[in-house]
Amino acid sequence: HQKRRKADPARRLAYSALLAVETHGAYANLALADHLRAAKLTGRDAAFATELVDGTSRGTGTWDRIIEAASCRAPAKLQPGVRVVLRMAAHQILAMRVPTRAAVASSVDLAGQVIGERVTGLVNAISRRISTHSLEEWATEIGGRDAVDVMALRTLHPTWIVKAFQDRLGTDEVEDALLADNEPPVPTLVVRPGLAQRDELGSGTPTRYSPWGVVRPGNPSDVAAVREGRAGIQDE
C-alpha cells in the first residue's frame, strides 16, 4: 500500500493528551498543558490542539453516542486509541470548521501512525459515516422525541445539566445558555509587579480594574514573561 502520510504535530499532541485522559484518568487541561510544554507547540498549532482537546473531551458523551449510531457498536468495545481518534474525528467534522475530507483523511493517518494499519479501514468507514449528517441531524436521529436528550446531544452537555439549566432558566433561554457555556474562557494574564511590564504581555484588552493585567486569547505560554515566571494567569 502507499506510504501513510505523517500525522501533523497538533493532532498527535491532542491524541496523546486525550489518550492520557481516557486511559489514566488525567484531567484534560493538565494533560494538554504538559504536552504543549513538552512539544514546544505554539501559535496556530497550539490553538488547534487546544480546541481539539477541549472540544473532544467536552463532547465525549455526544461523540460516543454518534460513534455508536454510525458504527452499530458500543464505543466501549473499541480499543481506547480508536475511541479517541473517532471522537477527535467527530469533533472536527461536526463542531469545527475542518473540511470533511481533511478531517477524515487526517484521522485515518493518525490512526495508522499511533495505533497501526489494521485499524485504518475501520476509522475511515466510521468517520465517513459520521460525516453523512450534521450535528443537528444526529441529535434528532438519536434523541428522537425526547427534547431534553436532543438538546443535550446538540449542545454537548449531559442531560442532567440540561435539566438543571431548565429548572433555573426556563425552556426559552436554556439552549443559548448551554451554547455560551461551551465558549472557551479567554485567559487573563497578569504581570508580577516589579518583575515585568504590562506591555510584555502582548496584544490584548487591558484589564478593567487592575493596572497589571491583559485579557488575551491564545496559549499563555506563548508569552515569554509567562514562561519565565514573571507573569501568570489569574482572574481579575
Language-model regions: role of each:
Residues 228-236:
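Conserved SAM-binding loop and adjacent beta-strand
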Residues 1-227:
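Class I Rossmann-like S-adenosyl-L-methionine
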